[in-house]
């Protein structure tokens, strides 16, 4: 835990290695907001989940931060049969006492990789269970909003995708406070895409593009966003008859099929699965578009050390990283010269290979 990174970069901290002088320093310097991985407000359960005998007693720091008007955001990684159900309800109710200085809490389902030998046997949530989590959270949002002007508790996008439900309207996200936790990313993307499309329709070039534009491109994404990106592609192909967009959800063989986010897709999985498509006769087009978060921050390198150039050579096509945004997606599909302008500096680097021991 490093409270400086929480303040500067938005990292979430558990408070487990912090002492009272550390909290007093935060208060004195008014370092806010402080983002806290709470997981549960049950002290005994928190010790168990974090494998730290001090984790429960560190919850007292929330009271001190609240009393000194330090703005906070909370996170609960929800594990089935551990801190869900009544435990999750208790956690939300307990944390709501820190309103309005705790401005938001996100509930995110635990990501479960295939590398779990010797670890607690976590299970995936079902569609029905995801719906129950959403219902419980949404039933509390109205009360908090009426009293504090904040919806406070938010279910991450994964719950809505798993439950097969529409994403909430933009107003429910309170200005996208928890975007880095996957709360509202899809709603923001959908709204940006729709706004960019309307702007394109009003442009002087639109009618001429409808008649003359011709291109075939492929988009690779994670399973989590596949349906949404596919709908975008269908919409653009209806707008431009000469446009063909193939959208493929890359299966995560490296970490396991239960990992569905694009940011944890390795180069080997991307290349291997798209080569299979090519070998089966699918014409992928002139360019492969990939989300910028597939690459390490500021680099053209995947998690497993394969590079964008490796993918270009293997697939024999241009590979372009796309900034996460509706306008950028449309620009990348319709503009062969598109280049991502900003570095993908919001991605946390995870090394997806083992170094040889010597």
Language model: regions and residue ranges:
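Auxiliary Fe-S-binding modules of radical SAM enzymes
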Residues: 97-98, 111-358
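Short glycine-rich or small-residue beta-strand-to-loop segments that form or flank ligand, phosphate
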Residues: 75-77, 105, 290-294
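Conserved Radical SAM active-site core
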Residues: 1-101, 111-140
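Structural preference for beta-strand elements that scaffold enzyme active sites
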Residues: 33-35, 71-73, 104-106, 152-154, ...
């Amino acid at each position: 835990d490093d409270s400086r990174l929480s303040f500067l970069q938005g990292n979430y901290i558990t408070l487990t290695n912090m002492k009272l002088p550390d909290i007093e320093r935060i208060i004195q310097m008014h370092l806010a907001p402080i983002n806290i991985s709470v997981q549960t407000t049950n002290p005994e359960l928190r010790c168990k989940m974090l494998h730290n005998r001090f984790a429960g007693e560190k919850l007292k720091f929330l009271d001190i931060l609240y009393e000194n008007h330090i703005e906070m955001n909370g996170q609960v990684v929800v594990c089935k049969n551990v801190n869900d159900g009544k435990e999750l309800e208790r956690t939300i109710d307990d944390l709501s006492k820190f309103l309005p200085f705790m401005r938001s809490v996100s509930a995110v389902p635990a990501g479960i990789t295939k590398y779990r030998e010797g670890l607690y046997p976590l299970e995936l949530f079902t569609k029905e269970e995801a719906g129950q989590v959403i219902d419980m959270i949404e039933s509390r949002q109205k009360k908090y909003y009426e009293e504090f002007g904040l919806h406070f508790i938010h279910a991450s996008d994964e719950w809505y995708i798993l439950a097969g439900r529409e994403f909430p309207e933009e107003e429910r996200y309170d200005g996208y406070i928890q975007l880095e936790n996957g709360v509202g990313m899809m709603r923001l993307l959908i709204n940006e895409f729709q706004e960019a499309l309307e702007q394109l329709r009003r442009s002087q070039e639109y009618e001429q593009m409808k008649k003359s534009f011709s291109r075939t491109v492929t988009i690779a994404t994670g399973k989590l966003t596949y349906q949404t990106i596919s709908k975008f592609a269908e919409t653009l192909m209806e707008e431009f008859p000469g446009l063909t967009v193939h959208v493929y959800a890359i299966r995560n063989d490296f970490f396991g099929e239960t990992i569905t986010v694009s940011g944890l897709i390795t180069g080997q999985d991307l290349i291997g699965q798209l080569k299979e498509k090519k070998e089966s006769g699918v014409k992928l087009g002139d360019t492969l578009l990939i989300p910028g978060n597939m690459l390490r921050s500021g680099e053209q390198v995947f998690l497993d050390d394969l590079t964008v150039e490796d993918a270009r050579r293997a697939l024999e096509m241009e590979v372009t990283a796309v900034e996460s945004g509706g306008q950028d997606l449309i620009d990348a599909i319709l503009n062969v010269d598109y280049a991502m302008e900003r570095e993908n500096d919001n991605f946390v680097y995870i090394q997806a290979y083992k170094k040889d021991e010597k």
